[in-house]
Amino acid sequence: MQKLELLYEGKAKRIYRTESADMVWVEYKDSATAFNGEKKETITGKGRLNNEITTLLFRKLQEVGIKTHFVEKLSETEQLVKKVSIIPLEVVTRNVLAGSLSKRLGMEEGTVLAEPIVEFYFKDDDLGDPLVTEDHIRVLNVASPEQVSVLRDMALQINQVLIDHFASCRVRLVDFKLEFGVTDEGAIILADEISPDTCRLWDETSNEKFDKDVFRRDLGNLTDAYEEILKRLGGISHV
């Protein structure tokens, strides 16, 4: 498989065409951004870590029957994935109060929720990726009610698999963001990535943060935090 011309470049990844109409080539970048791109930095090794961690987690999900776009890891920073039409919704599942939800509800960060909360955010940089209701989604016409139901169900299923998997590594899955795509056959499958860029991950005992909050809040060395997650998941750390 060959990497051809660049199709798209986002904050964290570049997407390239391949000679297969059904596949695209993903390259993870070393860029870190926060606050809708207002805070930016190049962090050497971050792309490798996100690629390695996403590979491990997508393989885990595929093992239990969850359909994803992941095909294979091509290098330390690259992977081959199925081409899909991305649904312009970020699906956020929350198990513990943190970040914007803690502020929105006026409740203490770290409060464990009795059951997970699923939220939808409209993917639009100009609007700041706003929180939307199912009624808003219908007005925006970006997903049908049936698709929204599938997104919610898949998010909750993935959540339970990841909660258990991270718990075995002594990590608490606080919350995480997913993106989904539609195949040419009309099936909804998991796309994008699952990494410390898209999850809040805390040590189950100390609540030490191993995610992008380290960068957002200037809590320490980002690559050290991501390396710790990779090590606990059984990947090969470069520390």
From Swiss-Prot:
InterPro entries listed in its UniProt record: SAICAR_synt/ADE2_N, SAICAR_synt_PurC, SAICAR_synth, SAICAR_synthetase, SAICAR_synthetase_CS
Catalytic reactions of this protein: 5-amino-1-(5-phospho-D-ribosyl)imidazole-4-carboxylate + L-aspartate + ATP = (2S)-2-[5-amino-1-(5-phospho-beta-D-ribosyl)imidazole-4-carboxamido]succinate + ADP + phosphate + 2 H(+)
Pathway it works in: Purine metabolism; IMP biosynthesis via de novo pathway; 5-amino-1-(5-phospho-D-ribosyl)imidazole-4-carboxamide from 5-amino-1-(5-phospho-D-ribosyl)imidazole-4-carboxylate: step 1/2
The entry's keywords: ATP-binding, Ligase, Nucleotide-binding, Purine biosynthesis
Single biological process term from Gene Ontology: 'de novo' IMP biosynthetic process
Enzyme class: ligase
SUPFAM superfamilies to which the protein is assigned, alphabetical: SAICAR synthase-like
Gene Ontology molecular function: any one: ATP binding
EC number: 6.3.2.6
UniProt entry tagged with the keyword Transit peptide: no
Entry's transmembrane regions: none
PROSITE patterns hit by this protein: SAICAR_SYNTHETASE_1, SAICAR_SYNTHETASE_2
Keyword presence, Nucleus: no
NCBIfam families according to UniProt: purC
Family to which this protein belongs: Belongs to the SAICAR synthetase family.
Name assigned to this protein: Phosphoribosylaminoimidazole-succinocarboxamide synthase
Native species: Bacillus thuringiensis subsp. konkukian (strain 97-27)
